[in-house]
């Protein structure tokens, strides 16, 4: 018997095993350092190295709405397993495990509140729920949120995070792509803003539908936004893709994303945008270029021009004579006689 087993109760509490919560330390994917979880929660799960970790709807709602005050929308129920799908596991079993993991019925959650004192409906896709895949439940959630935005004359904001359409629902999941597009069209007809926050990752059918038809596209730093994966593209075209391909910064340089905003600055940026689009706040004034600046610019351009400029005067239209080659008349071919000449008797 070890002497540690004969310790008094007080010392046993000191030297005994303690239950430690899981994921107390989280490894930064960018630097490899371990970061204390409480520190991550205070920084909205942005590591000191700047990596934006994936977060769920609860944290999104609390950080985006004014004063963390919002009301979650009740989303309609859909048929759970319309195709009775089964691969290595039953689809219903996958749904049960994802619900137990996230505490939600599906990957999409919606809430209404104020951002920058402006009415807004916010949709959040949870990548922890079956990869945020788009299915019937997510499609109904999107349409419900769009209808709420139309009813309350609010902006619709969505934070996308998805691997694409949910294969376990087949064509029923693909049908959600045009359905969500129609809902967005109704928002635009009502002159209500539709803003997309592209988070990591936004791929597949989601990137091919409602994720890329917003009025304004905001990307989180280094978020992957693509239809197909980089490895698939490289194997198809047999070429090496450029560095940073399909990342938010790469898309920003090429005009597919309007801005890249740190998650901690996102509420203020959204409030600024909504106040301009919905609050009647005038756009920031742009100072006109002074005449002196224009003259300096013209002088700089003149210095950069070649020393000698040869001007060629174009001929008048009347003076242009189009010479046509002389037409040569082809000799007609002799026609063959259709009847043979008659024989003559000598």
Curated annotation (Swiss-Prot):
GO cellular component: acetate CoA-transferase complex
UniProt subcellular location: Cytoplasm
Gene name per UniProt: accD
Highest taxon, organism lineage: Bacteria
Protein name: Acetyl-coenzyme A carboxylase carboxyl transferase subunit beta
UniProt cross-references to InterPro entries, sorted A to Z: AcCoA_carboxyl_beta, Acetyl_CoA_COase_Trfase_b_su, ClpP/crotonase-like_dom_sf, COA_CT_N
Catalysed transformations (reactions): N(6)-carboxybiotinyl-L-lysyl-[protein] + acetyl-CoA = N(6)-biotinyl-L-lysyl-[protein] + malonyl-CoA
EC number of the protein: 2.1.3.15
Primary location recorded for the protein, binned into one broad class: cytoplasm
